[in-house]
Amino acid sequence: MTPDVRPLVAGNWKMNGTRASLDQIKAIAEGVRPPLADKVEALICPPTTLLYVATALCTDSPLAIGAQDCHQKPSGAHTGDISAEMIADSFGTYVIVGHSERRTDHAETDHLVRAKAEAAFAAELTAIICIGETADERRAGQELDVIKRQLSASVPDAATAENTVIAYEPIWAIGTGVTPTSGDVEKAHAFMRAELVSRFGDEGRKMRLLYGGSVKPANAGELLGIANVDGALIGGASLKAADFLAIYRAYEALLA
């Protein structure tokens, strides 16, 4: 954790969820309540088909709703895409950009991720910018070089602690059940913090740094308690309200 920084626990549903899944969002919304909600923010990013309905379910809850991606342009002939403005119009407040699955499956570059983050800023959304190394890069000892490059190229100059969250997701840990050691996570997050402070000063100190990659109730307390880890970006474990809330409530002990 980082002193004076409000943590964020975010769920990325990826390409999962139909209208029947709204019961899980409703249960999460009912479980995100003060006093913990005053100290720790919670967010679910469902598929776009559920975005507007999900925000309607959360009008009386502190639970935030966001999207999983946006186009870099505000409108136009981009079949199948969604703009940041459309997300905001559906009352979403966050958008994930640069997730490794987008970088890999859709060949998204750091330059494109940066443009998407800038589009999010223009629509007054908070961008969750994802970075992380592959297994091959890690074996070659290049993980910090990759983090440095992606932070430099993917994060816009206009980034602030209010409009930007950084999510470190080592690609080899996503959906594999394999989690880096606490020391590995601490090293990566300390490096990110130093890079952000060097570039953005106090804004860099206050930016939230999330860890993602096989986060589950059993390891949440350990991961969320690491220095400079200001929350989590959760995949599969966010699909069930009980699992997501168990991770979220790990902060009850950490903040006691």
Curated annotation (Swiss-Prot):
It catalyses: D-glyceraldehyde 3-phosphate = dihydroxyacetone phosphate. Keywords: Cytoplasm, Gluconeogenesis, Glycolysis, Isomerase. Its EC number is 5.3.1.1. Signal peptide: none annotated. PROSITE patterns: TIM_1, TIM_2. The active site is at 99 (electrophile), 169 (proton acceptor). GO terms for molecular function: triose-phosphate isomerase activity. GO terms for biological process: gluconeogenesis; glyceraldehyde-3-phosphate biosynthetic process; glycerol catabolic process; glycolytic process. This is Triosephosphate isomerase. The gene is tpiA.
